[in-house]
């Protein structure tokens, strides 16, 4: 496992090991001022040194307004990389959780596991690495809340629960695609500080068994 806060280095790692999914806008150092005080990335490597897993977190300063207010204005800054998104036709819907989330808020993204490595799927690795990232987040960034977006097909497979997320808001984000009838639907998942503290007391085996 390697952890860092130099997102230019992280970008280069992705170009080498995850070229099909380059760095997304929320963690682009050309857009945001990212450093050890407000962000970190985490990668895991296999026995051959290849990157098999990524995730990252960064702080949003929402002391003056709610996450719902922020995302109504800025949800397009969380556009997924790859699909041909029609930003004008896309939308964000604030749920009751987002309307009360404020303060020091961490966005959790860049979550990826190499599809080619079937040996790691079903092993509980995502839960282990997710727990580790939350621990770093609590110690390094001390958030009041953590949130992220999960694609609907992925959340139906239970990823958010394996990571330990205790709240989810369905139909929170919809990315329309150019020249296609279907849209990419996403849930917003989140935890408050007390949720994080409680989750850390749960034996890991109870999340991955």
Whereabouts are the PLM-identified features?
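Long, compositionally biased intrinsically disordered regions
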Residues: 1-6, 195-209
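Acyl-donor binding region in acyl/amide transferases
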Residues: 70-174, 180-182
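Generic alpha-helix signal with a bias toward terminal, lower-confidence helices
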Residues: 63-64, 69, 120, 199-203
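Short, solvent-exposed polar/charged micro-motifs at secondary-structure junctions
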Residues: 10-14, 157-159, 197-200
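A conserved beta-strand-loop-helix scaffold within acyl/acetyltransferase catalytic domains
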Residues: 1-105, 109-111
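Short, flexible loop/turn elements at secondary-structure junctions
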Residues: 44-48, 59-61, 110-117, 150-152, ...
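A conserved mid-domain beta-alpha-beta active-site/ligand-binding segment of alpha/beta enzyme cores
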Residues: 178-197
């Amino acid at each position: 496992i390697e952890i860092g806060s130099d997102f230019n280095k992280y970008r280069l790692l992705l170009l080498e090991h995850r070229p099909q999914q380059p760095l997304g806008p929320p963690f682009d150092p050309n857009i945001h001022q990212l450093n050890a005080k407000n962000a970190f990335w985490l990668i895991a490597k296999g026995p051959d040194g290849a990157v098999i897993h990524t995730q990252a977190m960064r702080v949003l300063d929402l002391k003056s307004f709610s996450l719902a207010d922020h995302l109504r204005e800025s949800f397009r800054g969380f556009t997924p990389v790859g699909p041909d998104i029609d930003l004008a036709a896309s939308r964000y819907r604030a749920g009751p959780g987002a309307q009360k989330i404020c303060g020091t808020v961490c966005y959790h993204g860049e979550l990826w596991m190499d599809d080619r490595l079937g040996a790691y799927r079903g092993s509980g690795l995502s839960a282990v690495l997710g727990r580790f990232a939350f621990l770093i987040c609590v110690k390094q960034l001390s958030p009041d809340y953590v949130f992220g977006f999960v694609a609907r097909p992925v959340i139906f497979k239970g990823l958010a629960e394996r990571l330990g997320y205790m709240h989810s808001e369905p139909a929170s984000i919809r990315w329309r695609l150019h020249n296609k009838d279907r849209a990419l639907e996403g849930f917003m998942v989140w935890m408050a500080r007390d949720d994080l503290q409680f989750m850390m007391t749960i034996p890991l085996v109870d999340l991955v068994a």
